[in-house]
Swiss-Prot record:
EC number: 5.4.99.25
Organism whose genome encodes this protein: Legionella pneumophila subsp. pneumophila (strain Philadelphia 1 / ATCC 33152 / DSM 7513)
Protein's name in the database: tRNA pseudouridine synthase B
Reaction(s) the record says it catalyses: uridine(55) in tRNA = pseudouridine(55) in tRNA
Domain of life of the source: Bacteria
Gene expressing this chain: truB
Length: 303
């Protein structure tokens, strides 16, 4: 394993393939150490049970973490009918068990159709959502249950990949804030058989569908120069935003906090990708009335 002598300024995004059994924060800290990065953050937790894509932002890339938090996600998951747990996954205690049930392939397909599109979902008590500053999972472990409001989510894709009458494999594309284990549990409830999630793998975060993920073992075996080559440019996380090219004088002005006049045709309040004349990424701007632009989140190393 290559060790890092001292921390350096590193800016970019790494797509980590998080291992099972590790918290997202532990994975972040291990990777941060491998890169010797001064500043790092992840873009939405994966449960310890889960594996798959965990985008990690280093340095100036932490300024665009929110865009990745808000991005759609795609997963592969396995559910098991007949058993419910208090956590809705295989790490919890069994609270319901039924042996005599029959679910046909057609019934499963028909049930999945009910969960496509815009739906409401009640978050699990075993989640990181907070009640008066305390994470719900801590309250749940103390036997305390808090009423949770159903939240609007969007399931844009829900495909049945395998089903043997007991275990079912799904691919799911969904909006932020979707709890896949609760989706699996809800599907089981609709089928009147109960269900819990046994596996969860995040396939990708929107915007990184075709990018490679790296495991911790792979990164550990690389020299630092090769690790750095794994980083993705910051602006790839915001490719869905409209790009705007600024002149040198406009770059200087917006860095000074001034509003610049740039007839973009963008809708007022729309976020924009800002570049200098040499195609260097400047950061995120926001469209104002009459096409003016103000700074929203600028990166500090752009010239």
């Amino acid at each position: 394993m290559t060790t890092i002598e001292s921390q350096c300024s590193i800016d970019g995004i790494l797509l980590l393939n998080k291992p099972q059994g590790m918290t997202s924060n532990a994975a972040l800290q291990k990777t941060k150490h491998l890169f010797g990065a001064k500043k790092a953050g992840h873009t939405g937790s994966l449960d310890p049970l889960a594996t798959g894509m965990l985008p990690l932002c280093f340095g100036e890339a932490t300024k665009i973490c929110q865009y990745l938090l808000n991005a759609d996600k795609s997963y592969e998951t396995i559910g098991r009918l007949g058993i419910k747990t208090n956590t809705a996954d295989c790490t919890g205690e069994v609270i319901f068990c039924i042996e005599n049930y029959t679910v046909s392939h057609e019934e499963m397909i028909a049930t999945l159709e009910k969960y496509k599109g815009k739906i409401k979902q009640i978050p699990s008590m075993f989640s990181a959502l907070k009640h008066k500053g305390t994470p719900l999972y801590r309250l749940a472990r103390e036997g305390i249950e808090i009423e949770r409001k159903a939240r609007d989510i969007v399931i844009s894709q829900l495909n049945l990949e395998q089903f043997d009458g007991e275990c079912f494999t799904l691919t799911v594309s969904c909006s932020k804030g979707t709890y896949i284990r609760n989706l699996v549990e809800d599907i089981g409830d609709t089928l009147k058989a109960g269900a819990h999630m046994t596996k969860l793998h995040r396939l990708y975060t929107a915007g990184f569908e075709n990018n490679r993920m790296y495991t911790l073992d792979e990164l550990q075996d690389m020299p630092l120069s090769q690790r750095l080559a794994c980083l993705i440019p910051i602006d790839q996380a915001v490719q869905h935003l409209t790009p705007v090219i600024l002149s040198d004088s406009e770059v200087t002005a917006i860095r000074q906090g001034k509003v610049i006049s740039n007839k973009t045709g963008a809708v007022e309040g729309e976020d924009l990708r800002l570049y200098g004349e040499q195609s260097q990424f400047i950061g995120i701007g926001q469209a104002l009335i009459h096409g003016d632009i103000k700074a929203k989140r600028l990166v500090s190393f752009a010239l």
